[in-house]
């Protein structure tokens, strides 16, 4: 059985992983959802140490799963934790030749849906429903709205992360994502990661709306 370290995105807290954690446990896996806001951090390196401090000591060669805007942290976290696999869940994939900040400034709508530009779902409930949880049933939606929280330090996109070397990667995308353009994530997964690219009939938060399906994918990752 595998150990999973779950990294929340920029618009949810760690409790957003609760449904997926339950599904992983049914398959005998252990998982921990870290809180990136648990301690102050001024750099990506400090943030990686915040993550490491919350991972149990007996988690060896874990699978690191990061969602959405915290994708740029994956390489550094994987290196620090000596991860066995990286999973990019509807996540931003950094480029070695330019920072994500530079890429976003030069061509924002090549990465993001044009509707998403300028929106903040952490202060606007209709925006949270429309962009993050539009594929949820009512019960799930009510719960999901309670997990919304802003975490968006400016330094997150301002530097180039280290290369992932030979670490296996899997990219999971929602074909109805209203935040990140699926066409961009497909290109980035292939050209920047050489990753296996898997699509789900979901929006931007498949761990919320499709936890069983996400758990099935994670359960089948190579050991």
Indicate where each model-derived feature is located.
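Conserved serine/cysteine hydrolase catalytic core
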Residues: 151-212, 216
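Flexible "cap/lid" loop of the alpha/beta hydrolase fold
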Residues: 79-122, 155-156, 181
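Conserved alpha/beta-hydrolase fold motif
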Residues: 64-65, 86, 171
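Gly/Ala-rich beta-loop-alpha elbow adjacent to hydrolase catalytic centers
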Residues: 65-74
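Conserved alpha/beta-hydrolase catalytic His-Asp/Glu region
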Residues: 119-163
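Conserved HGGG/HGGXW glycine-rich cap/lid loop of the alpha/beta-hydrolase fold
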Residues: 2-40
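Active-site loop/oxyanion-hole signature of alpha/beta-hydrolase fold enzymes
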Residues: 30-63, 78, 101-109
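Short beta-to-alpha linker loops that shape the active-site pocket of alpha/beta-hydrolase fold enzymes
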Residues: 35-39, 92, 203
């Amino acid at each position: 059985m595998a150990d999973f370290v779950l990294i929340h995105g920029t618009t949810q807290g760690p409790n957003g992983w609760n449904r997926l954690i339950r599904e992983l446990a049914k398959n005998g896996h252990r998982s921990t959802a870290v809180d990136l806001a648990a301690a102050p951090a001024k750099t990506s390196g400090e943030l990686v140490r915040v993550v490491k401090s919350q991972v149990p000591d007996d988690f060896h060669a874990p699978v690191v799963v990061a969602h959405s805007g915290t994708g740029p942290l994956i390489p550094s976290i994987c290196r620090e934790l000596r991860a066995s696999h990286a999973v990019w869940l509807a996540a931003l994939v950094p480029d070695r030749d330019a920072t994500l900040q530079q890429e976003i400034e030069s061509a924002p709508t090549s990465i993001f849906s044009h509707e998403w530009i300028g929106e903040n779902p952490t202060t606007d409930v209709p925006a949270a429903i429309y962009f993050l949880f539009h594929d949820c049933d009512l019960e799930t939606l009510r719960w999901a709205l309670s997990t919304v929280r802003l975490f968006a330090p400016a330094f997150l996109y301002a530097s180039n992360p280290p290369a992932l070397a030979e670490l296996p990667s899997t990219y999971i995308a929602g074909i109805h994502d209203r935040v990140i353009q699926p066409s961009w994530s497909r290109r980035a997964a292939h050209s920047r990661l050489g990753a296996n690219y898997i699509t789900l009939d979901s929006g931007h938060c498949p761990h919320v709306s499709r936890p069983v399906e996400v758990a099935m994918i994670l359960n089948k990752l190579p050991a």
